[in-house]
Amino acid sequence: MCSDKNIHIAVRKLVCYGLEKSLISAEDRIYAANAVCEVMGIEDYDPPAENFTGVELEPVLRELLDYAVEKGLAEDGSVSRDLFDTKIMGCLTPRPSEVIEKFRRLYREKSPEAATDYYYKLSGDSNYIRRDRIAKDMKWTAQTEYGSLEITVNLSKPEKDPKAIAAALKAKPSGYPKCLLCEENVGYAGRINHPARQNHRIIPVKINGERWCLQYSPYVYYNEHCILLNSVHTPMKIDRAAFGKLFDFVEQFPHYFIGSNADLPIVGGSILTHEHFQGGHHDFAMASAPIEETYAVQGFEDVDIGRVKWPMSVLRLRCTDYERLVELGDKILTKWRSYTDESAFIFAETDGVPHNTITPIARKNGNAYELDLVLRNNITTEECPLGYFHPHSELHHIKKENIGLIEVMGLAVLPARLKDEMEALADTLINKGVNAVRLDPDLEKHADWAEEFAAHRDITPENVNDVIKDEIGKVFMKVLEHAGVYKRNAKGAAAFRRFVSTI
C-alpha cells in the first residue's frame, strides 16, 4: 500500500527527473507537478523540499501506477497501466511546437546529427521509447558466409493481458486515428486497442515538396530506428517518386539510411495502408556486403551496378548523382514489374494479380549515393500458401512472419515465445537428451532442427546456449535464402544475369 507521503515523494522525483532531462525548465516545475497531481487525483500535495538527482524513471512510474490502481484510477493490467503512465509522462513532455523549434534550430545552427541526437534522446527520456523494455530484448550476432547477421528476440512489445483482449473485442470501432502511423497520434489519449501517445512528438519535414513527418519507432529494433511517414493516410507505393523521396531524405539527413518495405502483401511490412519509410543510424550487414558481380547498362555508364553477395537477390547502384540512381532504379523496377521467367519460377502475375516488386534502400556512402534494390515476388503455391519466396514450413518453428525491410537488411526480429523455448530446449538437451525434444509438446516443433544440429555439435552445459543461438542464426540465413528470388547456385546466378540483360 502506497502512503500519501510516498506518493508525494514520487511526484517530486518525477518532476526532478523532468528537470534533469530538460523535458521541463525550472519555470515549469510547479505547473508540471500540478498536472501530474491532477492525473493522480492528488488534491493536497505536500512535496518534499529535496531536489532528487539521478532519478530512475521506471521505479517511480511503477510506484505511481500502483497507487493509481489502488485508488481505482487505472485497472491492473499491462494495457491499462501503459495508457495511464503515458498520460503521466504527457505532463512532462514539451509541446510539439517547442520540440520542432529546438530541432530546427539545432539543424540550422549545428548539424542534422545534432538535431536527431536531441530528438532521439527526448523520445527516450519522455518514455515514448520505453528503454527499460528495449533492454529486455535478447540480442546477439551470428557469423555466416554473408557477414555478421543480427538476431533479436522481441520482448519489448508487452503481451496483452486477458482482460485487455476481452475489452478490445467489446470496444467500439474507431476511425481516429486512422492507423498507428497517422500524425493524429501526437498527444492522443489512446484506448484499450490503440496505444496512448501523449508523450509522442513528430518533426515535420519537406519531402518531394510535400509535408512528411519524422518520428522514431517506439520499439527501436536498431540504433535510432526512425520512421518517415506521409502526413496523408495514403497507401504504400514503390515507384520512381518513392526512390526520389528516399534520396530527398538522405540529402537532408546524410548520416541516416532510409528504406521502404515492398508494396505487396507477404513481401511487404505490416502496414501497407499508410505510406512510410524506415531508416536510422545503424550499419547493417547488407550495407557492408561486397559486390560479387558487376554489370553495365547502356546509357548509365556513370553508374556502378553490381550484384551484392547476399542471401537475397540485390542489385546495388552507386553514383555521385542520385538523380541517375532514381532514373535507373525506375527503369529496373518497371522491367521487374512485368518480368516473367518460368524456368526460374518468376511470374509477373497470375490471374491478373501482380507478384513482382522491390524493397529499396538508399544511403550516402562517402561522396557517392547508393540504392539497393532487393527483388521480391509474393507468389503462393499449394505447398507454400504463405509465399514461395518466403521462409518455408521447415523454418516456421523459428520465423514464420513476413520478411520485411529490417530482416532483408540482416536483422532478424523473432517472436517472444522463443525466449522460453530456447531455455527449455537447452535444459532438455543437457538433462534429457535430444530424443526427448520430440516428446515435449512445447518443443516438438523444434525436434527435426535440434536432431540435425545435435548430430554434429558437441553440446555441453557450458556451450548449449551459444550453440542454440548460433543455430538460430543459421536458420535466419536460410530464411533469407528462401526469400531470395534467385537462389545461391549456378542456375540462380544464370537466371539473375538473364534478368539484368533485359534492363
Predicted regions and their residues:
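Secondary-structure-rich domain cores
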Residues: G209, P218-D263
